[in-house]
C-alpha cells in the first residue's frame, strides 16, 4: 500500500524558516523507518521544481492497509506529525492506493 502526502507550508513563513522546517520534517518522517511495524519505505522530497504547487511530499510504502492504519496512530508518527508537520502546514492532500 502506498501513502502519498503533499503539503503546502504556511504563507507567513520566511524562505529560511521554510527551508529549516522542510529539513526537520524530512528528518522526522524518514526517522520513522524501522520504528513502525509494516512501514517498508519512507521518503520525503523537499526539493520540488518551481512549477510545483506543493512544498514537500511524503512517499511511503506499507505491507498492507492494516499497517497503514497502525501507522496513523503510532506514537512515533503522531509525535512527528504534531511537533514538526501540523504547526507549519496550511494544506494537506493524501492519496492511499494498492500497489
Label for each model-derived stretch:
Residues 1-9:
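Active-site-flanking beta-strand signature of metal-NTP-handling nucleotidyl enzymes
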Residues 5, 58-60:
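Conserved RNP beta-strands of RNA recognition motif
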Residues 8, 46, 96:
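Residues that line or immediately flank small-molecule/substrate-binding pockets and catalytic motifs
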Residues 10-12, 49, 63-67:
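Short coil/turn motifs at secondary-structure junctions
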Residues 13-20, 68-70:
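Short, conserved charged micro-motifs
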Residues 21-25:
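Hydrophobic alpha-helical membrane-association signature
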Residues 26-27, 31-35, 39, 61-95:
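An amphipathic, aromatic/His-enriched active-site/gating alpha helix that lines ligand/cofactor pockets
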Residues 30-57:
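Short, glycine- and small/hydrophobic-rich beta-strand elements in well-ordered beta-sheets
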Amino acid at each position: 500500500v502506498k501513502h502519498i502526502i503533499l503539503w503546502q507550508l504556511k504563507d507567513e513563513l520566511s524562505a529560511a524558516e521554510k527551508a529549516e522546517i522542510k529539513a526537520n520534517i524530512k528528518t522526522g518522517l524518514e526517522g520513522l523507518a524501522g520504528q513502525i511495524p509494516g512501514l517498508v519505505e519512507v521518503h520525503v522530497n523537499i526539493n520540488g521544481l518551481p512549477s510545483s504547487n506543493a512544498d514537500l511530499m511524503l512517499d511511503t510504502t506499507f505491507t498492507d492497509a492494516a499497517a497503514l492504519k497502525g501507522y496513523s496512530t503510532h506514537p512515533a508518527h503522531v509525535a512527528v506529525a504534531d511537533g514538526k508537520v501540523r504547526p507549519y502546514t496550511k494544506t494537506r492532500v493524501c492519496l492511499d492506493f494498492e500497489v
